[in-house]
Swiss-Prot record:
It is found in: Mitochondrion inner membrane. Heme b b562 binds at residue 51. InterPro entries: Cyt_b/b6_N (IPR005797), Cytb/b6-like_sf (IPR027387), Di-haem_cyt_TM (IPR016174). GO terms for biological process: mitochondrial electron transport, ubiquinol to cytochrome c. Binds 2 heme b groups non-covalently. This is Cytochrome b. Its main location: mitochondrion.
């Protein structure tokens, strides 16, 4: 699942950059910029859907990756496991700041 995580991360970064090129964060025009992305940008609706569903798939892959590590006893490698826990917290914090707060 590590390679799927890398593929999801690259997809999220690329679609996020392309969506950010057309998005306006101003409160009066944010909704119209999303409508502009979906209607006027070539394959904008597809980029938006890939970005939204890719985030869910990314977290599913993370949890499957952690579950596989727990099943095979990888938690015995303390340093590696602790780095993974720190990365999990960073990913959750990034998702909170990027998706929940706005």
């Amino acid at each position: 699942f590590g390679s799927l995580l890398g593929l999801c991360l690259i997809t999220q970064i690329l679609t996020g950059l392309f969506l950010a090129m057309h998005y306006t964060a101003d409160t009066s025009s944010a909704f119209s910029s999303v409508a502009h992305i979906c209607r006027d940008v070539n394959y904008g609706w597809l980029m938006r859907n890939i970005h939204a569903n890719g985030a869910s798939f990314f977290f599913i892959c993370i949890f499957l990756h952690i579950g596989r590590g727990m099943y095979y006893g990888s938690y015995m490698f303390k340093e590696t496991w602790n780095i993974g826990v720190i990365l999990l917290f960073l990913v959750m914090a990034t998702a909170f700041v990027g998706y929940v707060l706005p």
